[in-house]
């Protein structure tokens, strides 16, 4: 297992949940956190603890976004019309790395970030190497021609462990994806329950 995989699954172990729904997650075999004290029974969390855990879980799901970046997205969500929690999810789903993952061009969120950073992705015909790039409705995302036959790209498109959501229209024969609409929380195929309202409460303290 690579260091990147170890870090990824450490998030699963810390949360005690298989947050991406992957068959190889270690929490499929055990239900305690990482480290020598991971098997200790946890006491009831305070309201703050519950809110913090919800934030850590959502940050972890989106490839462990930094606190600075995550908080900036939250602030933007509060400035938009409507429910701040829903807005937060919508902004996270508009990230280019998220759309690349949803389109099944790669197997994991972590791989999506690296794939973009290495210049394998185009948006509306232009190469974009910033994983946090904000996709707009109608944007066409595509895998660069020379990257379409990479083994891990071909394997990812065949993964049966997750489906492509209806707000991303994918043509796997061309390796293209069109962002159809900004989703609501209920539209997003999370493997575990996400609670953005608790994150709003956390930052509103």
UniProtKB/Swiss-Prot annotation:
<dbReference type="Pfam" id="PF01479">
    <property type="entry name" value="S4"/>
</dbReference>
<dbReference type="GO" id="GO:0042274">
    <property type="term" value="P:ribosomal small subunit biogenesis"/>
</dbReference>
<protein>
    <recommendedName>
        <fullName>Small ribosomal subunit protein uS4</fullName>
    </recommendedName>
</protein>
<dbReference type="GO" id="GO:0015935">
    <property type="term" value="C:small ribosomal subunit"/>
</dbReference>
<dbReference type="Pfam" id="PF00163">
    <property type="entry name" value="Ribosomal_S4"/>
</dbReference>
<comment type="similarity">
    <text>Belongs to the universal ribosomal protein uS4 family.</text>
</comment>
<dbReference type="InterPro" id="IPR018079">
    <property type="entry name" value="Ribosomal_uS4_CS"/>
</dbReference>
<feature type="domain" description="S4 RNA-binding">
    <location>
        <begin position="94"/>
        <end position="157"/>
    </location>
</feature>
<feature type="region of interest" description="Disordered">
    <location>
        <begin position="18"/>
        <end position="45"/>
    </location>
</feature>
<dbReference type="InterPro" id="IPR005709">
    <property type="entry name" value="Ribosomal_uS4_bac-type"/>
</dbReference>
<keyword id="KW-0689">Ribosomal protein</keyword>
<dbReference type="GO" id="GO:0019843">
    <property type="term" value="F:rRNA binding"/>
</dbReference>
<dbReference type="InterPro" id="IPR001912">
    <property type="entry name" value="Ribosomal_uS4_N"/>
</dbReference>
<keyword id="KW-0694">RNA-binding</keyword>
<dbReference type="InterPro" id="IPR022801">
    <property type="entry name" value="Ribosomal_uS4"/>
</dbReference>
<comment type="subunit">
    <text>Part of the 30S ribosomal subunit. Contacts protein S5. The interaction surface between S4 and S5 is involved in control of translational fidelity.</text>
</comment>
<comment type="function">
    <text>With S5 and S12 plays an important role in translational accuracy.</text>
</comment>
<comment type="function">
    <text>One of the primary rRNA binding proteins, it binds directly to 16S rRNA where it nucleates assembly of the body of the 30S subunit.</text>
</comment>
<dbReference type="GO" id="GO:0003735">
    <property type="term" value="F:structural constituent of ribosome"/>
</dbReference>
<dbReference type="InterPro" id="IPR036986">
    <property type="entry name" value="S4_RNA-bd_sf"/>
</dbReference>
<dbReference type="InterPro" id="IPR002942">
    <property type="entry name" value="S4_RNA-bd"/>
</dbReference>
<dbReference type="GO" id="GO:0006412">
    <property type="term" value="P:translation"/>
</dbReference>
<keyword id="KW-0687">Ribonucleoprotein</keyword>
<keyword id="KW-0699">rRNA-binding</keyword>
